[in-house]
Amino acid sequence: KEIHGNRGKGCPVFVKEWPDPLAETKAITEELRDYHLMGIAYEDMAVLYRTNQGPRLLIERMMEYNIPFHMRDTVPNLYEHWISRNVFCYIYAALGDLSRSNILQIINRPARYISRDALDTKVIRWEQLRSFYQDKNWMLDRIDQLVYDLEMLREMAPAGAVNYIRKAIGYDDYLREYANERRLKPEDLFEVLDALQESAVPFKTYEAWFNHMDEYKEQLKEQSALREAEKEGVSLMTMHSCKGLEFKVVYILDTNEGITPHHKAVLEPDLEEERRMFYVAMTRAKDRLHIFYVKERYHKRQTVSRFVVETGLLGKKGDLEKNGKQGRK
């Protein structure tokens, strides 16, 4: 489908590639603020994304910059996912929470074959646990390794701790086995850990990271309460929810293969519906349209969406934008 504006010649469409989502969301936030300083109301701006999983980083960045926003859709809280809670339980244990309820969340994730019967006190004491397995040297080795791992975690920065839990302790292996037993895709579970690790990067201490999570949770609660109230600030919404609305400035977030079109859309009718949603998203912009995609996500190379290529806005291969530089207009 060829797309033509009906308001005469206006501003060019800006298509940009960013190194990663952190750079992408930082740029969007700064540009929204700049548009506001130019006299455009926040209510006349929108950021659109394919699914409600998309805006977490952007929400966190907008909170940091104190840019008002409202969400049309409910956004799941990454920090309340059961996988995230498992990671937090490791950190809580490293910081001294040896309550039975906390230790039960981690003791066999990954499998250490430690019986619940061995954890029969409200607060777990490692010496008592060793006594329970005193005639099984291989179990004593596992207990000692866990104690060592918790001591290591205590001194780490949050992002390093998440990586240590995944790779050194073996939580990724646990998730892989969990997924295989249930015929799930391990990659879908790893995405939660990737997002969690990405979230931890800006913070040097657990306290700062946990404080940020509390603020994020409160913001989601506030957005939920205000969803039916008067809409103030930048609109954040899925492509599906934006139909019928128009804004002076529109950003389309994460226009990469696997996101738009969604990786689950494989049949031609599904792909056509994805294409239609992308078209709807583009046509929400009255004055300025920005289409953003990333080069790398979670240390994996990404490809620009076929829908962006189909628009012809990328031009020749040599015209592709790199690292946030402006490409063809």
Model-assigned labels for residue ranges:
Residues 104-127:
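Helix-hairpin-helix
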Residues 9-13, 43, 65-67, 232, ...:
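Short glycine-/polar-rich loops that comprise or flank the Walker A/P-loop
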Residues 11, 64-67, 75-110:
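Conserved short internal alpha-helix adjacent to the catalytic or cofactor-binding core
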Residues 123, 256-329:
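C-terminal accessory regions
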Residues 85-89, 234-262:
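A short beta-strand element within the Helicase C-terminal
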